[in-house]
Regions:
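His/Asp/Glu-rich metal-coordinating catalytic cores
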Residues: 1-28, 33-172
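A short, hydrophobic C-terminal helix/tail in secreted or cell-surface proteins
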Residues: 173-179
Length: 179
């Protein structure tokens, strides 16, 4: 980042979470992009809670902790795609989405008050370059069951129209230069 020369990583102040760590049931990751996992090896030693992630995300998380020589044996829990974990009083279902990385997930969080859908980063890409396609049938079922709230990440919320497929972008990049 050119605005902060010499700084390798910036992350929000974790003080609020650290103050409530006795109530923390775990860290649940939606996918392995750096803006979602980059601070984990810096913050986790102050929390020492379980980390839930899909296989691909788990590999990248493990490498981050190895780089910092932090042992997370017993804390990293690998979650299979389209499965559910129980963090009482919550049930958290991983729902496959599409994005520009392997194994992106939305999370249906069943709470005593109702269902919350956290999308993580996503894109409705009919022709994804990597990974499987969005589990649209499951998302419809979740919608039909009722959603109390939806928490949604969006990089291009102020852009009108539909974003192009990653496959199309990849094809255009190969047409314009030697990659």
């Amino acid at each position: 980042d050119d605005t902060v020369p010499g700084v390798d990583i910036i992350y929000p102040d974790p003080g609020f979470i650290i103050d409530k760590k006795e109530d923390l049931l775990g860290i649940v990751l939606t996918h392995a992009h750096e803006d979602h996992i980059g601070a984990i090896a810096h913050v986790w030693p102050k929390l020492k809670c379980k980390i839930y992630a899909t296989p691909f995300t788990s590999v990248l998380i493990t490498e981050k902790f190895k780089e910092k020589k932090i042992d997370i044996t017993g804390y990293l829990k690998i979650v299979e795609l389209n499965s559910t974990i129980n963090l009482d009083p919550f049930k958290i279902e991983f729902v496959t989405l599409t994005h520009s990385i392997l194994e992106p997930n939305g999370l249906r969080i069943q709470t005593p008050a109702g269902n919350v859908l956290h999308t993580g980063d996503w894109k409705c890409d009919p022709d994804p370059l990597i990974g499987g396609n969005i589990n649209s049938e499951r998302l419809k079922e979740i919608g039909n069951e009722g959603v109390l709230a939806m928490i949604c990440d969006s990089t291009n919320v102020f852009s009108s129209g539909r974003a192009g497929s990653v496959s199309y972008t990849h094809l255009r990049a190969h047409e314009t230069g030697p990659y």
